[in-house]
């Protein structure tokens, strides 16, 4: 299957794709950013681009989700876009085509293995404008970044906007990303106005964690277990009424897990 055919199928399924997005998606070959089979991608499923040394899987999102993120980013030519993670460079390459030679794409990649993969794939990619790949610690050291960004896309689940990133969003700009815990998140557009943040809820989503370390942690790790219980409890609590006594017991369990030392043996 070609990208043109895939985009046509997404449009037929009701996924909003404007001409700028369509052109960029068709132009960028996902196979350049992964060595794994693309069969799942052609069937609108996520595909891996990297397995880390600790066994965590990093994926390129399903095409419909890629198109959805691009739609909600409201990208125009010449914009400066920041990505927290870039799906192995694939998403950055698409956005680079969209912003063109007058725009910039800045990737902040927290995980070293993922960053090296991203740098390697983008090095042999013909960019339209400028793409830079940074470590989190680099952000405060590059003077140009202080001018700020109109758009920031977070490509993995987080609970809050990192302070160092929120400070770089210009007034009237916004952060788009999946906010929540490991079980479920809400795709939020968080717009910055006069120092305050205003949320637009764009629906429920399921993304892997932005922090790859969470994927590399055993599910029996006390903090990981507490996060999963809390997230699942919030999800269920939004659908059915739970007795206050039960709520209190669950909250106490979560608190107790978070107070446990991280090196407790559980094998």
Please report, for each region that a protein language model flagged, where it lies by residue.
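SAM/dcSAM-binding transferase cores
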Residues: 1-3, 149, 179-267
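Class I SAM-dependent transferase core
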Residues: 1-98, 113-125, 206-210
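Short, structured coil/loop segments at alpha-helix boundaries
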Residues: 1-4, 15-19, 34-35, 109-111, ...
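Intrinsic-disorder/low-complexity coil detector
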Residues: 15, 45-47, 135, 260, ...
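Short alpha-helical interface elements
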Residues: 31, 35, 49-53, 94-100, ...
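General "foldedness" signal
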Residues: 35, 39, 56, 83, ...
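Short, intrinsically disordered/low-complexity patches at protein termini
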Residues: 46, 105-107, 129-131, 200, ...
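Conserved nucleotide-cofactor-binding alpha/beta core module
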Residues: 70, 74-184, 191-193
């Amino acid at each position: 299957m070609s990208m043109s055919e895939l985009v046509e199928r997404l449009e037929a399924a009701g996924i909003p794709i404007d001409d700028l997005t369509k052109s960029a998606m068709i132009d960028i070959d996902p196979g350049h950013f992964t060595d794994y089979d693309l069969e799942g991608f052609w069937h609108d499923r996520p595909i891996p681009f990297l397995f880390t040394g600790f066994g965590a899987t990093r994926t390129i999102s399903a095409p419909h989700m890629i198109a959805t993120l691009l739609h909600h980013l409201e990208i125009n030519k010449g914009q400066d876009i920041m990505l927290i993670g870039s799906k192995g460079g694939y998403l950055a390459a698409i956005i680079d085509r969209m912003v063109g030679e007058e725009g910039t794409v800045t990737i902040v990649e927290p995980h070293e293995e993922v960053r090296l993969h991203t740098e390697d794939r983008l090095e042999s990619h013909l960019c339209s404008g400028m793409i830079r790949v940074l470590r989190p610690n680099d952000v405060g050291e590059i003077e140009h970044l202080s001018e700020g960004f109109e758009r920031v896309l977070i490509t993995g689940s987080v609970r809050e906007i990192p302070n160092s990133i929120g400070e770089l969003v210009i007034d009237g700009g916004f952060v788009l990303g999946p906010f929540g815990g490991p079980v479920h998140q809400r795709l939020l557009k968080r717009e910055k106005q006069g120092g305050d943040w205003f949320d637009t809820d764009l629906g429920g989503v399921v993304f892997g964690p932005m922090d790859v370390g969470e994927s590399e942690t055993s599910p029996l790790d006390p903090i990981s277990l507490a996060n999963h219980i809390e997230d699942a409890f919030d999800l269920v609590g939004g659908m059915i009424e739970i007795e206050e006594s039960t709520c209190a017991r669950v909250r106490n369990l979560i608190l107790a897990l978070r107070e446990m030392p991280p090196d407790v043996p559980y094998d």
